[in-house]
Curated annotation (Swiss-Prot):
Residues 507-518 have a biased composition (Low complexity). This is Na(+)/H(+) exchange regulatory cofactor NHE-RF3. The keyword Transmembrane does not apply. It comes from Oryctolagus cuniculus. One of its GO terms (cellular component) is plasma membrane. Interacts with PDZK1IP1 and ABCC2. Interacts (via PDZ domains 1 and 3) with SCARB1 (C-terminal domain). Forms a heterodimeric complex with NHERF1. Interacts with AKAP2, BCR, CFTR, SLCO1A1, SLC22A12, SLC22A4, SLC22A5, NHERF2 and SLC17A1. Component of a complex, composed of PDZK1, SYNGAP1, KLHL17 and NMDA receptors. Interacts (via PDZ1 domain) directly with KLHL17; the interaction is important for integrity of actin cytoskeleton structures in neurons. Interacts (via C-terminal PDZ domain) with SLC9A3 (via C-terminal domain). It is found in: Membrane; Cell membrane. Highly expressed in the brush border membrane of duodenal and ileal mucosa. GO terms for biological process: positive regulation of protein targeting to membrane; protein localization to plasma membrane; regulation of monoatomic anion transport.
Length: 518
């Protein structure tokens, strides 16, 4: 029966920095990993991909039953060339209806035998998917979480034990013999029992664990597979992000997007009664995480507004309320990862891109640590007549680029750059692992201004030692230029036009926030 269906092998190749030119997504009430939005003249179109194709294999690995983000990750990690085995939409739906073993499509028996000798065990028609690591959020009731910690002879790390029935720990999803990987976003795999106990005590009345159950750990160990924190299950977390779909009305969407000097990110304010925003379930003080499938955690106010405008008459927002934002920050996870475990509604897309992690909440500091030193800096540079006024250096054979010879009074100096600052991001893109030449090219090709996330040497070493990813939301918000102090800008646009209006230019105004009606 399988022979009546003819999958196609599409070999895609691209230049460094180029996209393949298609979206890979899942849709509600539709099975399979779908190919959508193929760009004209792109590698995807040239390779023969068609809208509605279902991806069966990536570089020979059967992926039809895999988690969507694992499939996306396989494409992303393929580098500049990838081979996709696809089946057109109609054939795929017929094959599923006839209960055809999709794994047999496109391979001979000899090929199947060879693969079976060299790949992981097969289960349910695909490469066996081990249970994911999972996040568990515990909020103390009384004096106890309801668990104990133990070490196991001959094993590295700390494990959960003595889970009290109906306790906070049990209700949060903690299991006996779970291996503790992280405490509030900090890796503890190499920590001693005493160090982990101390971290739990210091956490106060709430804590987030990244845990791996006994069977999962055993299988990963046997297969020598490393745990990927971005693949962790978020399903047990009590506060979740929300996907809000809206269509613009005659007066716009009916909400304001605001950001102030003390506010991280962009928040929803002043939702109009009876507006599309209210009908869609948007709430005041919601924090915007993504717009139309793209993370905006590293974007400034204008960047977020521009993405919403590009959506035309409809938009999809991923938002979190204060409780969810607080919990995800405590876990040091980005709410953007919520897309991993969701079947996105029609019109939403998951791009082949890495999500941005979020820093943990500020907890009670150790009095012996200089906490203020452990912050990255966001620096916006406007090019002068003689350039930006600094040199970019790198050490051969070592990752990372760093700042040298910052000229006094230059745009770099005025923006806060200092000698030895390590470049983490260029215009929101992490460049820590990129070669020196590519970092230089990113800065040079950014035009007359560039935004850099940098970290001093001492702070960088601290974050590396703690295994804490460095991201822009850890930094203080960008300073507002002196010539714009006291000005409140509001952009208002509807179906017909976009216009700007200044509310006030009074020098004694107390508001430095950005405020955009949508």
């Amino acid at each position: 029966m399988a022979s009546t269906f003819n999958p196609r092998e599409c070999k895609l190749s691209k230049e460094e920095g180029q996209n393949y030119g298609f979206f890979l997504r899942i849709e509600k009430d539709t099975e399979g990993h779908l190919v959508r939005v193929i760009e004209k003249g792109s590698p995807a179109e040239k390779a023969g991909l068609q809208d509605g194709d279902r991806v069966l294999r990536i570089n020979g690995v059967f992926v039809d039953k895999e988690e969507h983000m694992q499939v996306v990750d396989l494409v992303r990690k393929s580098g500049n060339a990838v081979t996709l085995l696809v089946l057109d939409g109609n054939s795929y739906e017929k094959a599923v209806k006839k209960q055809v073993d999709l794994k047999e499509l496109g391979q001979s028996r000899q090929e199947a035998d060879l693969r079976d000798e060299n790949v992981a065990p097969v289960m349910n028609g695909g490469v066996e998917t081990w249970t994911q690591p999972r996040l568990c959020y515990l909020e103390k009731q009384g004096n106890s979480y309801g668990f104990s910690l133990k070490t196991v002879q001959g094993k590295k790390g700390v494990y959960m034990t003595d889970i009290i029935p109906q306790s906070v720990a049990m209700k949060a999803g903690v299991l006996a013999d779970d291996h503790l990987i992280e405490v509030n976003g900090e890796n503890v795999e190499d920590a001693s029992h005493e160090e982990v106990v101390e971290k739990v005590k210091k956490s106060g009345n709430r804590i987030v664990f990244l845990l791996v159950d006994k069977e999962t750990e055993k299988r990963h160990s046997e297969q020598k597979i490393e745990f990927r924190r971005e693949a962790a299950s978020l399903k047990l977390l009590p506060h979740q992000p929300r996907i809000v779909e809206m269509k613009k009305g005659s007066s716009g969407y009916g909400f304001y997007l605001k950001a102030g000097p003390e506010q991280r990110g962009q928040i929803i304010k002043d939702i109009d009664s009876g507006s599309p925003a209210e009908a869609a379930g948007l709430k005041n003080n919601d924090l915007v995480i993504a717009v139309n499938g793209k993370s905006v955690e590293a974007l400034d106010h204008d960047g977020v507004v521009e993405l919403i405008k590009k959506g035309g008459d409809q938009t999809s927002l991923l938002v979190v309320d204060k409780e969810a934002d607080s919990m995800y920050r405590l876990a040091h996870f980005s709410p953007f990862l919520y897309y991993q475990s969701q079947e996105l509604p029609n019109g939403s897309v998951t791009e082949v891109a890495a999500p941005t992690p979020v820093p943990p909440e500020v907890s009670s500091p150790d009095p012996t640590e200089e906490v203020e030193d452990h912050k990255p800096k966001l620096c916006r540079l406007d090019k002068g007549e003689n350039g930006y006024g600094f040199h970019l250096n790198a050490i051969r054979g070592l990752p990372g680029s760093f700042v040298k010879e910052v000229q006094k009074g230059s745009p770099a100096d005025l923006a806060g750059l200092e000698d030895e600052d390590i470049i983490i991001e260029v215009n929101g893109v992490n460049v820590l692992d990129e070669p020196y030449e590519k970092v230089v090219d990113r800065i040079q090709s950014s035009g007359d201004n560039v935004t850099l996330l940098v970290c001093g040497k001492k702070a960088y070493e601290y974050f590396q030692a703690k295994k804490i990813p460095i991201v822009s939301s850890m930094a203080l918000p960008l300073a507002i230029p002196a010539d714009s102090q006291g000005m409140l800008a509001e952009l208002e646009y509807n179906l017909h036009e976009a216009k700007e209006r200044a509310h006030s230019t009074a020098s004694n105004s107390s508001s430095n926030s950005e405020d955009t009606e949508l």
